[in-house]
């Protein structure tokens, strides 16, 4: 009887957590739709970053978001991508943060420059990006 009650409670908690996760993901999709509607592939980095700054969105840059998704992208000549943080989720015990970003992935326009970014880099895609940070 106790085992059955514990099982019912565990299953109920699992379904509640799944429902909350689905609600969070729906909110992320709304934010993504806004950015993707305003910022189209092919726009240059200068236009994208001006839009973000004008709309008060703080962003940071990170190399090669695609590599974190399991897609291989050569680091040689790779451009940096812009990330706008939209949420924080519970982190597993071995990480200090579990952040959710809108990722703006760019194709670098020019190769071999010293700069990591170029205002003429072309926007390749806009997507949701989850990143565990501060992990052991």
Predicted feature residues:
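Hydrophobic membrane-insertion alpha-helices, especially the h-region
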Residues: 1-14
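Residues within mature, well-folded domains
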Residues: 12-136
């Amino acid at each position: 009887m106790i085992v059955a009650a514990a099982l019912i409670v565990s299953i109920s908690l699992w379904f509640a957590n799944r429902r909350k996760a689905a609600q969070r993901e729906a909110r992320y999709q709304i934010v993504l739709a806004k950015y993707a509607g305003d910022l189209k592939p092919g726009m240059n980095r200068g236009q994208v970053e001006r839009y973000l700054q004008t709309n008060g969105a703080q962003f940071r840059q990170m190399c090669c978001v695609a590599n974190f998704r399991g897609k291989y992208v050569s680091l040689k000549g790779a451009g940096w991508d812009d990330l706008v943080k939209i949420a924080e989720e519970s982190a597993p015990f071995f990480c200090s943060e579990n952040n959710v970003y809108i990722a703006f992935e760019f194709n670098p326009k020019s190769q071999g420059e010293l700069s990591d970014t170029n205002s003429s880099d072309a926007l390749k895609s806009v997507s949701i990006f989850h990143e565990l940070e501060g992990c052991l």
